[in-house]
Amino acid sequence: MKNQAHPIVVVKRRRHKPHGGGAHGSWKIAYADFMTAMMAFFLVMWLISISSPKELIQIAEYFRTPLATAVTGGNRIANSESPIPGGGDDYTQQQGEVEKQPNIDELKKRMEQSRLNKLRGDLDQLIESDPKLRALRPHLKIDLVQEGLRIQIIDSQNRPMFKTGSAEVEPYMRDILRAIAPVLNGIPNRISLAGHTDDFPYANGEKGYSNWELSADRANASRRELVAGGLDNGKVLRVVGMAATMRLSDRGPDDAINRRISLLVLNKQAEQAILHENAESQNEPVSVLQQPAAAPPASVPTSPKAEPR
């Protein structure tokens, strides 16, 4: 018995390969997270779609509120009526809406001012690019005034813009007017034309024909040249003759610089003022301003004979 050999027991330990189910289960977690996020997203979108503008403002106000104020329930900004603690400005109040609302009229004025400034730049560029107009630059005065953009074509002793004592346009005046016409036609603003003369009495022509008629005829002749250059005839709102009533120079009423054509690109306010002068309401006409007594017709000077302009 003692010599009997004990049986040898061999234990084989097999390594169990992991099944694929454990690795494949991770996508379920990611998918569940994705579905949760999508559900939250669509829930937020649905809440936004059914909320009123007032509720949306209050929600936005809540998220702008400092955390400490929201938690402690401190004083709310501007004593808002928002039901959310710590709310900010109450945009639902009428007074607040008036303060926050932009001034539409002021924005329109700024846009119009910007358009007129651009027009001024375009005209300067046009003059510099054309040798003929560049040579006539001393006869052009462009500036911004309260009524809009003013373009003045000024006469000179050596180079008049019109025939002496006549409304016949000189060739270089025609070049200026026809060159700027397309530029003026490219903006919505309307135009006022005014003719000016010096203080010399008009000596030629029919009796009663004075600097008033001459300045008006020259302004109308300028209008015709603008239309011939491509300007829409409907853009001209007014053509007037001012005679020698508005001097441009302090050097004297007979200075050649006072003989000019003033072309005014009107802003909206100036245009409405001109239209209001001749407008009529449905019930009664607009009150007419009292006109001064008519001056006697200008007599033809006898001695010495005045120089025609």
Swiss-Prot record:
Residue span of region Disordered: 276-309
Membrane protein topology class: Single-pass type II membrane protein
One of the record's GO cellular component terms: bacterial-type flagellum stator complex
Side Cytoplasmic, residues: 1-28
Highest taxon, organism lineage: Bacteria
Main location: membrane
Keywords for the protein's UniProt record, in alphabetical order: Cell inner membrane, Cell membrane, Chemotaxis, Flagellar rotation, Membrane, Transmembrane, Transmembrane helix
InterPro entries in the cross-refs: Bact_OuterMem_StrucFunc, MotB-like_N_dom, OmpA-like, OmpA-like_sf
One annotated GO biological process: bacterial-type flagellum-dependent cell motility
Topological domains annotated Periplasmic: 51-309
Compartment(s): Cell inner membrane
Compositionally biased residues, Low complexity: 300-309
Residues annotated as domain OmpA-like: 149-269
Assembly and interaction partners: Each stator complex is composed of 4 MotA and 2 MotB subunits. 2 A subunits and 1 B subunit are thought to form a single ion channel, so that each stator complex contains two channels.
The family this protein is said to belong to: Belongs to the MotB family.
Role: MotA and MotB comprise the stator element of the flagellar motor complex. Required for the rotation of the flagellar motor. Might be a linker that fastens the torque-generating machinery to the cell wall.
Annotated protein name in UniProt: Motility protein B
Origin species: Salmonella typhimurium (strain LT2 / SGSC1412 / ATCC 700720)
Recorded name of the encoding gene: motB
